Each structure stands twice: as C-alpha cells, then as structure tokens.
Amino acid sequence: MTVINGIEIDCIDYKVNDIKYAIQNNDPIENKLHVLVVISNPCLYAIRYKLFNEFIRRLQDDEHIQLYVVEMIYKHQQFIVTSSSNPYHLQLKTKHPIWHKENMIQLGIRYLLPANWKAVAWIDADVEFENTTWALDTLKILNGSKDIVQLFSHCVDMAKDESTLNIFNSFGYSFSKNKAYTIKGLDYWHPGYAWAMTRKAYDKVGIYDKGVLGSGDSIIALSLINKVHINLNYQYHPDYKQSILDYQEKAKSLRLGYVPGVIRHYYHGTKANRKYVERWKILIDHQYSPFQHVTYDDVGILVPTKSFSKQFKKDILKYFKERKEDE
C-alpha cells in the first residue's frame, strides 16, 4: 500500500469500458450499416437541401454503409433530392404538413431495406462525423453488446460561421457514464441527431411516430431509461400521454449505448425560432390525441383525421414557417 498526502494511490476506481471492448472484440453484426436519411420541407427552406446534399456527399464513399433516402412532399411541391428510378430512394406525398420525420423513417425501413437486414441507423442530414470508423464501430457494438446506440459521444453545435455555440454530451454517452440526468448546462443529455438499433430491437419497439410537432428523439431516449414522464406536460390530453407511456413500456428494457466520437452540427436558423418550449402549447390548446386526430393512409403515411381541426393544421404550419431556417 502506498499513501501520499493521506491518499492511498493503489486503490484505483477502475471502470470497465464495455463500449471500447465491444469495438475491440466484436465482429460486425453485418457487412454494412443500413442508414436512413429523411427530408421533408413544407416551407422550402434552401438550407435544408444544401445541408442534405453536403451530407450525402460526405457519406456516399463509406464502404461500411448502405445509404437510403426518404423524401416527403406536400400538395404542389416537386421532388428535389430523390429519383423514382433509384431503388434506394422512397418518394412520399401527402396533403397536410405535420411532423413526419419518425413516420418517414419507419416507412423507409418498411419499403427500402432488404428483408434480412440486421441493423439500421437514422441520421439528421445537418451533421458531420469526425470519427471515420463510426459505422463499423456501430456494427460491432450492436452485435450482442447493445440494442440501441446514439452514434456519437459529443457534438459541436456550430454558428453560421462554424464557430462553436455549444458542446453537447450525447444521451447515450451520459447514460453509459452514469451521469445525473439533466436538461440544462454542460451536462445536458442531448437526445438527437443520430441513432441506430438492431433488427430485434426494432421489431420489438419500433420508433415512436405520433409526435405531430416533433420530440420523437426525446420520447424514444427517455423511454429507454424509464423517465419519459419528464417529457409529459400535465396539460397534455390523456391519450397522448398514454401513447408515450405505452411506448416506454416496450422500450425500457433495451440496452442503451453510444458510439465514441465527435459530430459537428451545422447551423440552420436560431434555436429561439425553433420554439422548443412554446410549440407544446399547440398540442395543449388543441388537446391532441393520437388515437383521435391521426391515422395512417394506404401507404402508411401519418395523416390527420376529420377530428383534426383546420386551426390545428394552420397552427402547425405557422410553427414551421416561424422557424425561419434560411435566416
């Protein structure tokens, strides 16, 4: 035993890094990671297409991924980034703009992926990976070690000039490091940007897609750690709260992890214009019920029912316009 300044230096607090061991020792669950990227643009923001095209260019030469694109258009819009002749593209069209991201991911999985797929990722098209082995690392971690992973440990959130606005820890990283859950400050558990899961996990829980104003990432992440009640405003309609709690019941037993590495998040409008807090007032004002207000059409697209009021639709479109992503 060696003691210096009253501290016993041989008594170390060593924690096994199971993520590192999985990368070092596991074989990939399959040869390629199936990566879905979705885009809808009801307000035709130019920056969305620009960032999307840059994202595709960065990933198209990665030998460890198979990339798929799902594009949703509304009313009189035209398809801009997909082709009907490309077997890796899915083109969807519907009338009313609501938040379709998670619905599009699930339709991409249904219509584009091969029948024998084993791992799927869904990634926002406004990020860039600094880790050149992120896809291979993901395939290894998902081969018996984790059921679902966030594809980064840290994120550099950038301003328009690419200077640093903030640095986030990923939700999966924070959970894996046994940090205290917080939604503010330097230790904020960021639930977004990029995820992947195994086929077995997806078949069990799917992806929550009933959030017509977003927050799917947050609902999924909090469900994994049995804390989704944090996201439930007491004024929400009971049906909405119940649908989220039902998802948590399926998801809470999954093994959550992360993929080591940094991503960069590109600027597309101010955070203030996203109105992450104010937007939930729309759901409260209209007492949104996923059991009454939405259904699926013949293709599987989430669409409003007759109970979904015109004003509700207008308020959602107004929110999309107020994001002002090209500013």
Task: Tell me what each language-model feature is.
Residues V70, V149-H154, V259, Y266:
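Short glycine/serine/threonine-enriched helix-capping/active-site loop
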Residues V120:
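Short aromatic/hydrophobic "clamp" motif used to bind/position activated sugar donors
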Residues I123-A125:
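Catalytic metal- and UDP-sugar-binding loop of GT-A-like glycosyltransferases, i.e.
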